Amino acid sequence: YSQVARPRF
């Protein structure tokens, strides 16, 4: 995917 927001753990 392009420009994907990574979930904060």
Swiss-Prot record:
GO biological process: neuropeptide signaling pathway
Keyword Secreted: yes
Domain of life, per lineage: Eukaryota
Main localization category: secreted
Localization per record: Secreted
Cellular component terms (Gene Ontology): extracellular region
Keywords attached to this entry: Amidation, Neuropeptide, Secreted
Signal sequence annotation: none
Tissue expression as described in the entry: Widely expressed in the nervous system. Expressed in corpora cardiaca, hypocerebral ganglion, frontal ganglion, protocerebrum, antennal lobe, tritocerebrum, thoracic ganglia, esophageal nerves, recurrent nerve and frontal connectives. Not detected in corpora allata, circumesophageal connectives, subesophageal ganglion, abdominal ganglion and abdominal perisympathetic organs.
Residues with Phenylalanine amide modification: 9
General function of this protein: Accelerates ovarian maturation in females.
Family: Belongs to the NPY family.
Protein's recorded name: Neuropeptide F
